[in-house]
Every structure is written in structure tokens, then in C-alpha cells.
Amino acid sequence: MKPENKIPVLTRLSDKMKAVVNFQQPGLPPWPADGDIETQRQYYLLERRFWNADAPSMTTRTCAVPTPYGDVTTRLYSPQPTSQATLYYLHGGGFILGNLDTHDRIMRLLARYTGCTVIGIDYSLSPQARYPQAIEETVAVCSYFSQHADEYSLNVEKIGFAGDSAGAMLALASALWLRDKHIRCGNVIAILLWYGLYGLQDSVSRRLFGGAWDGLTREDLDMYEKAYLRNDEDRESPWYCLFNNDLTRDVPPCFIASAEFDPLIDDSRLLHQTLQAHQQPCEYKMYPGTLHAFLHYSRMMTIADDALQDGARFFMARMKTPR
């Protein structure tokens, strides 16, 4: 689709979202478009420091967890001494960027709003690690904490997964992997999904939205996919194209959040409609006037904080509901 035919979303954003788009961090250099992946990762970490400031303080603990691929770093956020559940968080970044520090504020707020221990998983990034390594690392982390719950003062009878963007795909894929492989790490009471991609190769929203402002042009999405997958056949895998998995049974309750002007919004809509059609518990909410990745900007956008609180409320309600 010619770029000229796309919807001019920058003129339709909320005032708060426009303020974020136009915000210039003092001393921040331009995005290193021609830099190697490691340079881009360091820039992303630097750029996110401002957005992660002034986060709630709480007890944190870093733990290296053994997996079949080597140790994976995790960070435990404990807002109180005891927790009614454990929530595993997978960060976004197109499978190629991000770490526990780039999403620190999101995880701290989620821990505060749920009152539960949140465990961030610093899964291996692509292209150095290819599908399904990040999922298998996540499953290994869940298994480890299930077996060492007392050591870390965790309640793993009730667990959940959460993630944003690529992390949302990993969150849902990991939960389905546990179900499909009959791996028991606790009762998955909910999955919290913010503006994820779930396997669509094309859609109306991918044609109408996406540009330099969000890093989600058609070329960008193809690049992320090629970095993550081993080969073309992986595109149809039921843990990458999640619409090729069985979504008619035993899907944990899903909170599905989307951004109004996100090229990936149709992934969220289709996921919600599919689950709803098969009586799988789910809730869908679209946040008006927003772009992809708006969850990061809670320092300037109350709607980002609202989206986190909405997911937290969904999770807490499922803590009280026996499954």
C-alpha cells in the first residue's frame, strides 16, 4: 500500500499522545537507523531511562535461572511480603530489543496494582536466539520457580502471564505451550495482553497504519519476523501463528488491550472475536487516541496507567474465581 494512502494518524492522536510523540529528551542522539543491532539495543535502553524514572519502590531480587539454553536473568518485584499469585512478565521490543530495565516501570506498576509478585523474564533476543527459544526459556523459568517457590516466598498455585507487543505473543504462546505439552507450573488464572501480534500476516490495520513514528511499517514487521523465526515454515507454527492453535478450549482468561492507531490492532480484535465465539473467557478494551507502545508513557499519559490498572483488575478478579 502506498504510504500516501495510509490514514494520517498523527493528526488524530490524543493531545497526550501527541505530546509524547513531540517530546524531545535533552541530549538524546537520533535513533541509529544504520547502526548494528547491539548499537540499537543500547540506544533503546538509553531512550527508555526517562520513561522508567519515578517508579514505585519495592523489594526486588535478581535471580539467574538455569534453562536448556543457559542461565536466564529474572527480576522479582515483591510489593508485599506475601502474594496471592505470581505473574510472569515478557517485555516487548520486536523480539530483538528490550530487557528488564527498559520495562522496569511497567512491571513495578503492575506489581503495585495487583499486589502480587511480578517476575520479569529477560529472555534471549533474536536474531541470536530463534523461535522457539524464548518460549522454552519462559517455560523453564516457570518450572524452576514452581519447584523453588518456598525459597523465593512465592505463591505458584495461581500464576499468570503478561506482556506487551512481542511480549504479549510470548505470554500467550507460553501459556498455550504449557497446556499443549501438559506441563504443570501452577494454575494459569489469567493472561494480560497489551497490543500484541498473534500471527496475522496481513490485515486492514496493517495496511492503514504504521510508519516512522511507531517502527511498524510493513518492512519493519517483516524484519522482526525474519529475525525471530528459523525459516518460513515457522510462520504457521501454532506457537507463532496463534490462530493456528486450538483456541476453542482451555484457554486461560485473557485481557486483550489494543491501541487505536496500531497496525497490530486487528490481531487483538481477531483474538478477542475468536475466543468470544468459542466461549473462552476474555475481555477486550481499546484505548482511544493511542499508538503502539503507549504503555511506556505513564509519566505523561494517564491512559497508560489506566491500561495497566485495567489489566491488574482483571487479574485480581481471576484470583478470586476458582477454575
Curated annotation (Swiss-Prot):
Source domain of life: Bacteria
Q: Which PROSITE patterns does this one have?
A: LIPASE_GDXG_SER
InterPro entries found in the cross-reference section: AB_hydrolase_3 (IPR013094), AB_hydrolase_fold (IPR029058), Acetyl_esterase (IPR023508), GDXG_lipolytic_enzyme (IPR050300), Lipase_GDXG_put_SER_AS (IPR033140)
| Broad class of where this protein is predominantly found | cytoplasm
Question: Which Gene Ontology cellular-component terms appear in the entry?
Answer: cytoplasm
EC number(s) from the headed UniProt entry: 3.1.1.-
Gene3D superfamilies recorded: alpha/beta hydrolase
Keywords of this protein's UniProt record, alphabetized?
Cytoplasm, Hydrolase, Serine esterase
Its name, as the record gives it, is Acetyl esterase
Question: Per UniProt, what is one Pfam family of this protein?
Answer: Abhydrolase_3
Specify the enzyme's EC class, one word: hydrolase
Q: Where is this motif: Involved in the stabilization of the negatively charged intermediate by the formation of the oxyanion hole?
A: 91-93
**Family according to the record:** Belongs to the 'GDXG' lipolytic enzyme family.
Q: Which gene encodes it?
A: aes
